[in-house]
From Swiss-Prot:
This is Furin-1. It comes from Xenopus laevis (African clawed frog). The lineage of its organism: Eukaryota, Metazoa, Chordata, Craniata, Vertebrata. The record marks 105-106 as: Cleavage, first. Ubiquitous endoprotease within constitutive secretory pathways capable of cleavage at the RX(K/R)R consensus motif. The chain crosses the membrane at residues 702-722. Residues 119-433 form the Peptidase S8 domain.
Amino acid sequence: MDLSPSLLLMLWTLLSVLVEEITGQKVYTNTWAAHISGGSAEADRLCKKYGFINHGLIFEDHYHFSHRAVMKRSLTPKRTRQVLLKREPQVHWLEQQVAKKRKKRDIYTDPTDPKFMQQWYLLDTNRHDLHVKEAWEQGFTGKGIVVSILDDGIEKNHPDLQANYDPAASYDVNDQDPDPQPRYTQLNDNRHGTRCAGEVAAVANNGICGVGIAYNANIGGVRMLDGEVTDAVEARSLGLNPNHIHIYSASWGPEDDGKTVDGPAKLAEEAFYRGVTQGRGGLGSIYVWASGNGGREHDSCNCDGYTNSIYTLSISSTTQMGNVPWYSEACSSTLATTYSSGNQNEKQIVTTDLRQKCTDSHTGTSASAPLAAGIIALALEANKNLTWRDMQHLVVQTSNPAGLNANDWITNGVGRKVSHSYGYGLLDAGAMVAMAKTWVTVGPQRKYVIDILSEPKDIGKALEVRRKVEPCAGMSNYISTLEHVQARLSLSYNCRGDLAIYLTSPMGTRSCLLAPRPHDYSADGFNDWSFMTTHSWDEDPAGEWVLEIENVSNNNNYGTLTQFVLVLYGTASEGLSRKFDGDGSRNVASSQSCIVCEEGYFLHQKSCIKSCPQGFTSSIQNIHYTLDNNIEPLLVNVCVPCHVSCATCKGTTINDCLTCPAHSHYNLLDYSCTHQTQRSRESPTLKDSSHDYVARTSNLPFIVAILSCLFIIVVFGSIFLFLQLRSGGVLGRKRLYMLDSGIISYKGIPSGAWQEEGFSESETEETAAHSERTAFLKQQSTL
């Protein structure tokens, strides 16, 4: 059989490659590298002379040649052509090129675990997935991140978990020992925690089961559901080793029966708070929570105080086809979604199982939360400085609503799609990791509390409460962009399940805080229950908030709303410039107690002005506002009035005048203004200089003082002279006269005068005669 030359060449090339692979022998190509002096012209001349092709410079005087007559791959070098060319004096070095084995140093290859190809939610080229492969390709697999599963224990010796098991992230709270191994039963009741653990950190490439999303993360477990669950048990679990554990994943909560309203008690609530404020060295523990499986009972996850907490990252479920599962609960506190089980024809979740087995039938929102915990571990590996709130911001900004089917998608005030069934959409691991790498930590959390009701309100068939809110810039509770919003309500109602409650933000986002629950016949109402929504994330809180409470039944129900406290959480990191009008002012609704001005403006009569008017001067005042029983300090640039005697001033006292009003004189010595008399109000003649005028006006107080003193002395002397003349006729006589009307004394005479001179003889006689007359009159009156 005749073979064409091209076919023979191809076969020879393939044979060369095969020999190379088997023996490791060198394979020579039809290219050379040469060091030739004389420039490109000389290199071209030599190539033409010996049949080479010049492919150009490699770098200075070094050229890349090839030869058509030489096979592209050969096991032996072509020495003849090389020797001939090398004899040329301009050729300093020549070498036939050898094919080298080089492999791409990819950091990612698909896991080889036998069940990996069944993990459709990790990698599905036909439909949407969680984009986990994109995160792996960026080099993140959870290394250095610690996740603990709060559940019924973890099978620490499972072959697909053992290599990643972390005893420091584990404990048995039920039996008070360090071993979280589940209690085995015939029904395998305590498999839940082991299944959740495998979703997060099942080991990769070990030939067992599938792979965890964060397959290099450390995984632990807390056995706390296999016994009496108390407030203390929950608190100890939530607070386990908070500076070692980064992420806590919980797929449990109160009964999903459509009638229960329950949440963390005092100790658990304190554990949450301590976790987010002290965990991870102050960055905050991250709590991932399953939103609940009460969909068939028309339950609301806003009646679950764990998923409804601002401290938890609440995760819902969607099916393989992107539909709302039959078990899913809708509520406004859900932040995002991952995949889980659906109808019978839809696939479920692959993970580790009890008794060192593997399962492909993990279901419910119990399966969704650990997938989210794994993705969060990847993001945390990309940036270990993320706070607990940073992580929620990343989830909001990167979650993808595409492909998720629901009839309640809306676009909120900042242009994001959000749903009560899905939150902001499907978690996207690749996008989260990419954003996490360059994420800048958000500003400190701020809290603004407004007590809305001044008196109880009858609910009746429907009740609407409106309130304009304007958080004030410069105050510690000022918020420019929202995160969580809570409506803390207390109300009585004879059938709680007939109520629907909505909250509409100033930017028009309407959150369903409570959907009707047909199985809830309770007459207990709500007692200071916090309904939370994430749907207004990043919106501006300023403006009118509207609370609606509606009786959806035809029954004549009755009840009273006794408390409505609006609690806003967010940041002031957006900057204040966009908050002010063009004139530097920020006006406040009349119901508010404050107004603030941009830097460079001054507060004056509830408006902002560039400079203070005449009669006022600028000042910084520490004003205290009373807000919801809290006294908040605020430093304000204000215009304060001058003293009444000043026209303009530098302060508020009488000695801070800069200029005086008309008909007043300015005193340069004490910077005061003195009001002129009517006589002195004549204008100075034109020939008088302003200096002479000021001098005269400044001497006036001294002249007035001197004249006043002289006047007082004259009056005093006149009175003294008059009294002296009346008492004795001359100044030298110091006598007292006894008259019928009594003793007349001059109080200015020293008391020593009575002792210096006694009575005269005539005065003694007059006194005796007077006494006799007095005695005679008394005797006559007696008769």
